[in-house]
């Protein structure tokens, strides 16, 4: 992998000079192979090491180079043709392949090549961008968007119309991460590299970016960019410094352990505020 890293880093330094006509064969093959590895889940843009999420920026650079160098092509679909630089992930799948991977994809869901979808996953009509990683047992409901490089954990439920923000540029930005066993309520937006930690429940219509205040009503603590594990979060507001108006905030109304989460319905947790 070190060889790939060096080739990609060197190519990215020259990205404004490189094009389809002058790129060398080794660099082109490396870029395509990195995207193949992403597509198969053998590498990922971000991974958790020693309980800390680490972003592999060189993989993001590979995606950008792939997009710079690819030409638009026509892709055939059952309902429409498409014209894009990145092919569709499942354009060559047959029934046997879907069954082997235990994935259900409902039309007209769009999943771009270079994203990874693990087994036992259901994808309703939605959009999954390149570089995204969706782990096993996850449900992506209707009109949900999983942005570029977003990381979705195991047994996650992304409800209808949810937006999970993508990030390719600026390079220093980290991807949005939804950890294992989370529930994201309908029409919520989690963006700008925010991390929703394991076992959290986000109510309908909650918007969280890096500048959003995340208020823990039990402790009075205000967080940014991270929802702690096993939190139940709803939309709310906090008074301004001069107390003349209120500003939007996400409010942690309670924390629940995994046993409670397994026993109690999500709707009940949100009602008992």
Curated annotation (Swiss-Prot):
Name of the protein this chain belongs to: 2,3,4,5-tetrahydropyridine-2,6-dicarboxylate N-succinyltransferase
Source organism: Buchnera aphidicola subsp. Schizaphis graminum (strain Sg)
InterPro entries: DapD_Trfase_Hexpep_rpt_fam, Hexapep, THP_succinylTrfase_dom1, THP_succinylTrfase_N_sf, Trimer_LpxA-like_sf
Cellular location(s): Cytoplasm
Record's keyword annotation contains Protein transport: no
UniProt EC number: 2.3.1.117
Keywords for this protein: Acyltransferase, Amino-acid biosynthesis, Cytoplasm, Diaminopimelate biosynthesis, Lysine biosynthesis, Repeat, Transferase
Main location: cytoplasm
Protein origin, superkingdom: Bacteria
Gene Ontology molecular function, alphabetical: 2,3,4,5-tetrahydropyridine-2,6-dicarboxylate N-succinyltransferase activity; nucleotidyltransferase activity
Swiss-Prot/TrEMBL catalytic activity: (S)-2,3,4,5-tetrahydrodipicolinate + succinyl-CoA + H2O = (S)-2-succinylamino-6-oxoheptanedioate + CoA
């Amino acid at each position: 992998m070190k060889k790939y890293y060096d080739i990609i880093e060197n190519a990215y330094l020259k990205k404004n000079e490189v094009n389809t006509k002058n790129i060398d064969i080794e660099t082109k093959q490396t870029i395509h192979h990195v995207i193949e590895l992403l597509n198969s889940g053998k590498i990922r843009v971000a991974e958790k090491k020693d309980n800390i999420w680490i972003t592999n920026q060189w993989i993001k650079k590979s995606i950008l180079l792939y997009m710079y160098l690819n030409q638009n092509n026509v892709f055939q679909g059952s309902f429409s043709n498409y014209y894009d630089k990145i092919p569709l992930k499942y354009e060559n799948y047959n029934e046997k392949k879907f069954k082997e991977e235990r994935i259900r994809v409902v039309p007209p869901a769009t999943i771009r090549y270079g994203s990874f979808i693990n087994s036992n996953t259901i994808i309703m009509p939605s959009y999954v961008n390149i570089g995204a990683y969706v782990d096993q047992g996850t449900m992506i409901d209707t009109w949900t968007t999983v942005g570029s490089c977003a990381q979705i954990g195991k047994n996650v439920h992304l409800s209808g119309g949810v937006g999970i923000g993508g990030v390719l540029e600026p390079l220093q930005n980290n991807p949005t991460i939804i950890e294992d066993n989370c529930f994201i309520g309908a029409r919520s937006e989690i963006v700008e590299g925010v991390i929703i930690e394991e076992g959290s429940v986000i109510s309908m219509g909650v918007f969280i970016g890096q500048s959003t205040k995340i208020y823990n009503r039990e402790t009075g603590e205000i967080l940014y960019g991270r929802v702690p594990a096993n939190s139940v979060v709803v939309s709310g507001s906090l008074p301004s410094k001069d107390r003349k108006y209120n500003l939007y905030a996400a409010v942690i109304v309670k924390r629940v352990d995994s046993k409670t989460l397994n026993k109690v319905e999500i709707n009940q947790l949100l009602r008992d505020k």
